[in-house]
């Protein structure tokens, strides 16, 4: 947080901290699931800022849970070992050989690196995966390409979440860092899209919020038209435009939609290229990204006059 306000005057600093108070009160003892991805995973300064954000949330009483993918790192390792990477319908084609790399990179590299960064602040983070204690159960996913169901290998969808062991980690005051690989009932291990996994997990554990880090400012309804950026959208509105979105954004917005329809109070798509973007979205009036709301949103738990988004008037949504 110091990085956010170090260049501000004393009065402005005080106002920034005071502005965060209702949000700090609201998120105390609440679970916040954060999907870690994009530039925040590859830029050293952004990685450090993200880790600090998770510790900040934990220190003020929230219960952060991190779900991560590892696309750039997987692609780099595939190139190093001479394996061809291929995508179909926005998903990585995952042969058994590619799956070995995915498994190694997600849990053995990306997850361990993030656990280490968080634990540089104290003994907070615990690495785990969808394989551990039956957290996720998956089934094979077929991708629709030009109307044709297409086999993309060991890519799965989550069909069950057993979060009992994960809740033990959370209730012990730790920060779970979840790698998105999962066993299927057929005995295979599947590569799970991290956006999809984060949304499913958030709904299953009764999270208050889901945040998805991206490399853009939020949801553009007509990418790349910058004027089409929206600061908030309700579930039915999102569902209507989902098929026409940019292919890279569809899994992220689908995850948000499923989360809010699964009981999560709101989901957020935020720009992971901004240091401390998680804190800026959760703890400042108006936020910085796009907020996805259920069709009926209960404001009674928030102080009167709370401004959720920058273009709200009198706190209305």
Swiss-Prot record:
One of its GO terms (cellular component) is cytoplasm. The record marks 35, 252 as: Transition state stabilizer. Pathway: Amino-acid biosynthesis; L-arginine biosynthesis; N(2)-acetyl-L-ornithine from L-glutamate: step 2/4. Keywords: Amino-acid biosynthesis, Arginine biosynthesis, ATP-binding, Cytoplasm, Kinase, Nucleotide-binding, Transferase. The keyword Cytoplasm applies. It is found in: Cytoplasm. The keyword DNA repair does not apply. GO terms for biological process: arginine biosynthetic process via ornithine; L-arginine biosynthetic process. It catalyses: N-acetyl-L-glutamate + ATP = N-acetyl-L-glutamyl 5-phosphate + ADP. Substrate binds at residues 70-71, 92, 191. It comes from the Bacteria. GO terms for molecular function: acetylglutamate kinase activity; ATP binding. InterPro entries: AceGlu_kinase-like_sf, AcgluKinase_fam, ArgB, Asp/Glu/Uridylate_kinase, Glu/AcGlu_kinase, NAGK-C. Catalyzes the ATP-dependent phosphorylation of N-acetyl-L-glutamate. Belongs to the acetylglutamate kinase family. ArgB subfamily. This is Acetylglutamate kinase.
């Amino acid at each position: 947080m110091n990085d956010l306000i170090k260049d501000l005057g004393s009065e402005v600093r005080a106002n920034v901290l005071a502005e965060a108070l209702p949000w700090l009160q609201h998120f105390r003892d609440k679970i916040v699931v954060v999907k870690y991805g994009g530039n925040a995973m590859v830029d050293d300064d952004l990685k450090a800022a993200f880790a600090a954000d998770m510790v900040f949330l934990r220190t003020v009483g929230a219960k952060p849970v991190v779900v991560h993918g590892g696309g750039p790192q997987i692609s780099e390792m595939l190139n190093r070992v001479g394996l061809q990477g291929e995508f179909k319908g926005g998903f990585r084609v995952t042969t058994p050989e590619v799956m070995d790399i995915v498994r190694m990179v997600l849990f053995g590299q990306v997850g361990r690196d993030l656990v280490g960064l968080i634990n540089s602040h104290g003994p907070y983070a615990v690495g785990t995966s969808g394989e551990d204690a039956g957290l996720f159960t998956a089934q094979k996913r077929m991708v629709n390409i030009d109307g044709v169901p297409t086999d993309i290998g060991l890519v799965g969808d989550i069909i069950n979440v057993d979060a009992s062991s994960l809740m033990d980690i959370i209730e012990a005051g730790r920060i779970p860092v979840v790698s998105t690989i999962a066993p299927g009932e057929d005995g295979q291990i599947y590569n799970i899209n991290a956006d999809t996994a984060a949304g499913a997990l958030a709904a299953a554990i009764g999270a208050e919020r889901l945040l998805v880090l991206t490399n853009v400012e939020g949801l553009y309804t007509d990418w790349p038209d910058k004027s089409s950026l929206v600061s908030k959208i309700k579930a039915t509105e999102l569902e209507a435009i989902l098929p026409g979105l940019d292919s890279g954004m569809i899994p992220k917005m689908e995850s948000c939609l499923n989360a809010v329809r699964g009981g999560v109070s709101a989901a957020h798509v935020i720009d992971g290229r901004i240091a401390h973007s998680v804190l800026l979205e959760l703890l400042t009036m108006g936020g910085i990204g796009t907020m996805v709301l259920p069709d009926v949103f209960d404001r009674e738990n928030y102080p009167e006059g709370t401004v959720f988004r920058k273009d709200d008037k009198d706190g209305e949504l």
